């Protein structure tokens, strides 16, 4: 049987003439599940019931816009020649780091307006962010994007992957199978989610769950990015995601060390104020 016939169609279904892509469905599913989990913890930690929903009404669209701006700016040579494609986000091309920057800035401004500690909210939201990223990476899988370098089919079989994943990792235009880097990052984030949920019970200083997320995600992204073939570059061989990841690690570690030394007495995660 033709291998291409076994691959997943990136279009899930049609609403009349409008194609609904798996990519969009998975992104939306990730946001919804992240909200449900985050909302439960937010109320438990004493935030108003509508706080997280109000924040997401601003953070989600701003994050998507920032993610697209980040991606387009890194490939401006292409988009300056094809401006009509700038809005085609349904075909992929949104950068997670751009989305995170947009979300963090929005959350910081929102919490300042509401007179709520940003780090309190960031700690609550950190596991939910990972949930969104875990699911969102499968949108890349459906679109056959964000993959790594060539590998043999035997390599993928040795990873004990099911056939439907192996088949999707065959890229027709390359004529080869590729590293499922989307899966590596999704699994890395799943491990990170488990770690953060454990850290919640330790009752760390305020901000340390969020900074731990920043460190964990950045370490994984740095190494996995080095395997990808579609990286966005800043200058020469410098990959933008790796540079941002280094910054994330430094900021996360630096913030934990600084606050442990300078912020006394420190608020704890379980302090509902």
UniProtKB/Swiss-Prot annotation:
Keywords of the record: Cell membrane, Membrane, Transferase, Transmembrane, Transmembrane helix
Location(s), subcellular: Cell membrane
PROSITE patterns in the record: LGT (PS01311)
Pathway in which the depicted protein is active: Protein modification; lipoprotein biosynthesis (diacylglyceryl transfer)
GO molecular function terms attached to this record: phosphatidylglycerol-prolipoprotein diacylglyceryl transferase activity
EC supergroup of this enzyme: transferase
Taxonomy, superkingdom: Bacteria
InterPro entries per record: Lgt
BP GO annotations: lipoprotein biosynthetic process
Residues in coiled coil: none
Pfam families: LGT (PF01790)
One Gene Ontology CC term in the entry: plasma membrane
Documented EC number(s): 2.5.1.145
Membrane topology of this protein: Multi-pass membrane protein
Main localization, broad class: membrane
TM region positions: 18-38, 47-67, 89-109, 116-136, 178-198, 207-227, 238-258
Family assignment from sequence similarity: Belongs to the Lgt family.
NCBIfam families assigned to the protein according to its UniProt record, in alphabetical order: lgt
Entry function: Catalyzes the transfer of the diacylglyceryl group from phosphatidylglycerol to the sulfhydryl group of the N-terminal cysteine of a prolipoprotein, the first step in the formation of mature lipoproteins.
Record PANTHER family: PHOSPHATIDYLGLYCEROL--PROLIPOPROTEIN DIACYLGLYCERYL TRANSFERASE, PROLIPOPROTEIN DIACYLGLYCERYL TRANSFERASE
Protein name: Phosphatidylglycerol--prolipoprotein diacylglyceryl transferase
Naturally occurring in which organism (per UniProt): Lysinibacillus sphaericus (strain C3-41)
Taxonomic lineage from the root: Bacteria, Bacillati, Bacillota, Bacilli, Bacillales
